[in-house]
From Swiss-Prot:
GO biological process: glycine decarboxylation via glycine cleavage system
Residues passing through the membrane, by range: none
Signal sequence, start to end: none
Function: The glycine cleavage system catalyzes the degradation of glycine.
Annotated GO MF terms: aminomethyltransferase activity; transaminase activity
Reaction it catalyzes: N(6)-[(R)-S(8)-aminomethyldihydrolipoyl]-L-lysyl-[protein] + (6S)-5,6,7,8-tetrahydrofolate = N(6)-[(R)-dihydrolipoyl]-L-lysyl-[protein] + (6R)-5,10-methylene-5,6,7,8-tetrahydrofolate + NH4(+)
Protein name: Aminomethyltransferase
Name of the encoding gene: gcvT
GO cellular component annotations of the record: cytosol; glycine cleavage complex
Subunit organization: The glycine cleavage system is composed of four proteins: P, T, L and H.
Organism: Shewanella pealeana (strain ATCC 700345 / ANG-SQ1)
Length: 364
């Protein structure tokens, strides 16, 4: 029996095409994935992300615990509401999950983890918390709606009350604030501005309807995937997993090496990997017709004239750019051209940093 979010009936009302997503009944689209994609790039769209897992970490040792648990350093967070992105690593340096952590106070943090990894994540967190004076509390009574796009904030402002609008006025990216019953954060998974709003289950349908009435278009998993890939954002399970270290997943910037004495999980293994060198995650763009897909092979010749091979982790047709884009894990020696094997032929591709579209515009 698939799990249903509290917004399931709202998806049916909007003719959502429901599919199984890691055990959850979620909308793939509401008629046109392309229209939903363009709505977020050009206007405003919203996503039900209530399948994500909200976990509160509270106690005297909350900071110390998260500094051990995460490769990024929550001690950098000094202003209440400030958030950071990073990986939760195993002892081999593999990525158990990528997540966002909000600093609420020195003894209170909120983390949001992926739905596909929920059970594994919670088991790992509860194992690691032993010995720390910390309470780890999952919050299944909370739903989450992401409102994204250039007009998302203005349209959402017509839904929020005066006190909520005052609380979020001028809020920088990667912040969250509790405003009335809503936790409103300037985060997202699209490369556009907007909010992720955590809302009590019993208020979620009314909030969704209010956003609909404000002219915010409902968007499904299909558009969510093309948007995040255009933005160069990783999808756990495709672009990285426990077999992949963060340095090979374009997450090196999220590893806080200083202070050197902070012994986060996986640090020793990761230091060894860093010293020896590892593969890297790159972006690919293809002018030719066709679509690059997950699992295809990438070939290039290195500066020594030796052929090297990598693998496509995520690929799609980019509705914004009008051609195929992809992310690929490849040996570090790659230059700025390569070939992808498609239908037994090799097709030339350009190699770029893995970021294609930000704020509605080409990012390279």
């Amino acid at each position: 029996m698939a799990n249903k979010t509290v917004l399931f009936n709202k998806h049916l009302e909007s003719n959502g095409k429901m599919v199984d997503f890691h055990g959850w009944d979620m909308p793939l689209n509401y008629g046109s994935q392309i229209e939903e994609h363009h709505a977020v790039r050009q206007d405003a769209g919203m996503f039900d992300v209530s399948h994500m897992t909200v976990v509160d970490v509270i106690g005297d040792d909350a900071c110390a615990f998260l500094r051990k648990l995460l490769a990024n350093d929550v001690a950098k967070l000094k202003v209440p509401g400030k958030a950071l992105y990073g990986g939760m690593l195993d002892h081999n340096g593999g990525v158990i999950d990528d997540l966002i952590t909000y600093y609420l106070s020195d003894t209170e943090y909120r983390i949001v983890v992926n739905s596909a990894t929920r059970e594994k994540d919670l088991a790992w967190i509860n194992e690691q918390v032993k010995g720390f004076s910390v309470e780890v509390t999952e919050r299944p009574e909370l739903a989450m709606i992401a409102v994204q796009g250039p007009n998302a904030k203005a349209k959402a402002a017509t839904v929020f009350n005066d006190a909520q609008n005052a609380a979020i006025e001028g809020m920088k990216p990667f912040f969250g604030v509790q405003a009335g019953s809503l936790f409103i954060a300037t985060t997202g998974y699209t490369g556009e501005t907007g909010y992720e709003v955590i809302v009590p289950n019993d208020e979620a349908e009314a909030l969704w309807q209010a956003f609909l009435d404000a002219g915010i278009k409902p968007c499904g998993l299909g558009a969510r995937d093309t948007l995040r890939l255009e933005a160069g954002m990783n999808l756990y399970g495709l672009d990285m997993d426990e077999s992949v270290n963060p340095l090979a997943a374009n997450m090196g910037w999220t590893v806080a090496w200083e202070p050197a004495e902070r012994d986060f999980n996986g640090r020793q293994a990761l230091e060894k990997i860093k010293a020896e060198g590892t593969d890297k995650l790159v972006g690919l763009i293809m002018d030719a017709k066709g679509v690059i897909r997950h699992g295809m092979s990438v070939f290039f010749t290195d500066s020594d004239g030796v052929e090297q091979q990598g693998t496509i982790t995520s690929g799609t047709f980019s509705p914004t750019l009008g051609y195929s884009i992809a992310m690929a894990r490849v040996p570090r020696s790659i230059g700025d051209v390569a070939e992808v094997e498609m239908r037994k032929k090799r097709v030339p591709v350009k190699v770029i940093a893995p970021s294609f579209v930000r704020n509605g515009k080409q990012a390279f």
